[in-house]
From Swiss-Prot:
Membrane topology reported for the UniProt record: Single-pass type II membrane protein
Function: Glycosyltransferase involved in the elongation of O-linked ligands to activate Notch signaling. Possesses fucose-specific beta-1,3-N-acetylglucosaminyltransferase activity; extends the O-linked fucose on the Notch EGF repeats. Boundary-specific cell-signaling molecule that is responsible for dorsal-ventral cell interactions during wing development.
Coiled coil: none
A GO BP entry: wing disc anterior/posterior pattern formation
Chain sites annotated for binding Mn(2+): D238, H351
The family this protein is said to belong to: Belongs to the glycosyltransferase 31 family.
Gene assigned in the entry: fng
Catalytic machinery residues: D327
Protein name: Fringe glycosyltransferase
Length: 412
């Protein structure tokens, strides 16, 4: 005959507590498995998260209101050479009166509406879920970055279509044809066909001056935001991009985290002085910026924070206010307004540094290269291959060094 065991109240309480702990553990493990497999496909960023950011960008500068603009010239970049460590700040005298950020429109429509539209247009529904991962106790591993996750933009102009653009199309563009877009200032049916529709006429002014540069960068940023890609990488039309190395680099970082990857061309931060009539002391802003001539990359999480401040053409307005070119304006927005530091990646290279010092046995490790023709001399890499008359910019020789299977490469 079976006997019933009567548990005392403390024993019953202990059993109930054990059952509850088991249930919590099962639910927790289920959530972890679901998160790792599916993420958060339906997530929307709350109003407060982005509105607070936009508010900070406006209100933190209201105490610095001054009276009028005083125009000043754009500073020239320092000469070539690797930046040396220096405690001295580079001081750019920029006497701007009435530096007023209260008149920068944060958003013409509610932020949630803008982000909802971005999510709907996105070809990858899981992109926005990454924004909440830092608030989760058990954060999954960063997602693997593939070539198709990257939006590569190249800034060019009509006068360089037959020279710089043609050289890129024959070389590294062939490794990223679906991911690379050229931003120019005219219609060109020939190169529109050569790029399979990847030539965008920004309607910006022609020329290499501040207004035109900021206009094109603004267009690049807006097109990226609509693309749904995880990474935005900007390059100039005198850059050679080592596409596999770029993918490998970005795979080391998560697009869900605020990343500003690039390389400065100066050895210390840029300092802008703001003169005020209302105070006895000058205001100053200090920040780093990645030089556009070497290329730089932004994570999607960071660009979404930039959206209310610089999206929809507002990038141009900020460039007009500080009166600096596009790459400096980008650094001002990211480092100064959003307080996201530049992460220096030495594998980016611009024509402002001597190319000959990049060793041939390290070519496969570099992300970008460049060239320049100054004072009747070429600033180019030293690489075996075609002669200087055939390949003065050394891009064909470099390409064949990295990818010898291309048809125009000489047999080894």
């Amino acid at each position: 005959m079976m006997s019933l065991t009567v548990l005392s109240p403390p024993q019953r309480f202990k059993r109930i507590l054990q059952a509850m702990m088991l249930a919590v553990a099962v639910v927790y493990m289920t959530l972890l498995l679901y998160q790792s497999a599916y993420g958060y496909p339906g997530i929307q960023v709350p109003h407060s998260q982005v509105d607070a950011l936009a508010s900070e960008a406006v209100t933190t500068h209201r105490d610095q209101l001054l009276q009028d603009y005083v125009q000043s010239s754009t500073p020239t970049q320092p000469g070539a050479g690797a930046p040396a460590a220096s405690p001295t700040t580079v001081i750019i005298r920029k006497d701007i009166r009435s530096f007023n950020f209260s008149d920068i429109e944060v958003s013409e429509r509610p932020t949630a509406t803008l982000l909802t539209e971005l999510a709907r247009r996105s070809r990858n529904g899981e992109l926005l879920r990454d924004l909440s991962q830092r608030a989760v106790t058990a954060t999954p591993q960063p997602p693997v970055t593939e070539l198709d996750d990257i939006f590569i933009s190249v800034k060019t102009t009509k006068n360089y279509h037959d020279t710089r653009l043609a050289l890129i199309i024959k070389t590294w563009f062939q490794l990223a044809r679906d991911q690379t877009w050229f931003f120019t200032d005219t219609d060109d049916h020939y190169y529109q066909e050569k790029t399979k529709g990847h030539l965008i006429n920004t309607k910006c002014s022609q020329g290499h001056f501040r207004k035109a540069l900021c206009c094109k960068m603004s267009a690049e940023l807006d097109v990226f935001l609509e693309s749904g890609k995880k990474w935005f990488c900007h390059f100039d039309d005198d850059n050679y991009v080592n596409v596999p190395r770029l993918v490998k680099l970005l795979d080391e970082y998560s697009p869900s985290v605020d990343w500003y990857l690039g390389k400065p061309s100066i050895s210390s931060p840029l300092e802008i002085h703001l003169d005020s009539k209302n105070t006895t002391t000058n205001k100053k802003i200090t920040f780093w910026f990645a030089t556009g001539g070497a290329g730089f990359c932004l994570s999607r999480a960071l660009t979404l924070k930039m959206l209310p401040i610089a999206g929809g053409g507002k990038f141009i307005s900020i460039g007009d206010k500080i009166r600096f070119p596009d790459d400096v304006t980008m650094g001002f927005i990211i480092e100064h307004l959003l307080k996201v530091p530049l992460t220096v990646v030495d594998n980016f290279h611009s024509h402002l540094e001597p190319m000959e010092f990049i060793r041939q046995d390290t070519f496969q490790d570099q992300v970008s290269f460049s060239y320049a023709h100054m004072k009747n001399q070429w600033n180019v890499i030293k690489v075996d291959g075609f002669d200087m008359k055939t390949d003065p910019k050394r891009f064909y020789s470099l390409h064949c060094q990295l990818f010898p299977y291309f048809s125009f490469c000489p047999p080894r």
